[in-house]
C-alpha cells in the first residue's frame, strides 16, 4: 500500500525533471502506466480489506516524524497510512478517476492545444505535456495522501498539496488570460 503513494510522487519528480527529454507520447504513456499501477494497488488493497470480514481500521504505517517528548511526555507528530472503510472506498474513487483523467488527457492534450498556448521561451509545445503530467501526478499523490492520512496534521499537509497542485493544473495554460484569472480564484 505504500507503493500507491510512492508511484505518483516518483512520476511527478521524473516527469518534472525530464520535461525537455521526453516526447509527448512517452510522457503520456508513463503517466498512464504509473496511474494504472496505482489503480491495481488501490483495488487490491480495498478488496483485500473488505474481503477480510473485519472492518476495523488498520494503520499500515505509523512512523514518528517530529518527536517532542523532551517538551511534553509522549508528544510527537506521526506520519503514516490509515485504512478504514471510508479510505478504502476513496482509494477506489481517487485511483479510478485519476486513471480515467490520464487516459482522457492523452487524447485531449493534442498538439493544437499545446501549440496554441506554448510559451515563446520554450520554443515548442512538447515541453508542456510533460509538465501537465507531472502536475497531474502531484495531484494524485496529494489526493491519495489525503485519503490515507493518519492524523489532522498529515491531512492538512496533503490538503495544501491538493490546493497547490490544483492551482498548477488550473493555470497550466499560463499564457492564456482566462486560465491565469481562473487560477487566482
Specify the residue positions occupied by each region the protein language model found.
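N-terminal signal-anchor/start-transfer transmembrane helix
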Residues: 5-20
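Transmembrane helix-loop-helix hairpins at membrane boundaries of multipass inner-membrane proteins
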Residues: 18-134
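Alpha-helical multi-pass transmembrane bundles of energy-transducing inner-membrane proteins
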Residues: 24, 132-185
Amino acid at each position: 500500500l505504500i507503493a500507491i503513494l510512492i508511484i505518483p510522487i516518483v512520476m511527478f519528480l521524473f516527469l518534472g525533471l525530464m520535461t525537455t527529454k521526453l516526447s509527448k507520447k512517452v510522457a503520456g504513456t508513463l503517466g498512464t502506466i504509473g496511474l494504472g499501477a496505482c489503480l491495481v494497488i488501490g483495488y487490491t488493497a480495498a478488496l483485500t480489506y473488505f474481503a477480510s470480514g473485519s472492518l476495523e481500521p488498520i494503520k499500515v504505517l505509523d512512523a514518528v516524524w517530529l518527536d517532542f517528548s523532551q517538551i511534553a511526555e509522549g508528544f510527537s507528530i506521526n506520519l503514516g497510512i490509515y485504512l478504514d472503510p471510508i479510505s478504502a472506498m476513496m482509494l477506489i474513487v481517487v485511483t479510478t478517476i485519476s486513471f480515467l483523467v490520464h487516459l482522457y488527457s492523452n487524447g485531449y492534450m493534442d498538439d493544437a492545444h499545446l501549440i496554441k498556448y506554448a510559451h515563446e521561451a520554450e520554443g515548442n509545445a512538447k515541453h508542456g505535456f510533460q509538465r501537465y503530467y507531472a502536475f497531474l501526478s502531484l495531484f494524485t499523490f496529494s489526493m491519495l495522501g489525503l485519503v490515507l492520512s493518519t492524523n489532522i496534521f498529515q491531512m492538512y499537509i496533503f490538503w495544501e498539496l491538493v490546493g497547490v497542485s490544483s492551482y498548477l493544473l488550473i493555470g497550466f495554460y499560463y499564457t492564456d488570460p482566462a486560465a491565469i484569472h481562473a487560477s487566482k480564484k
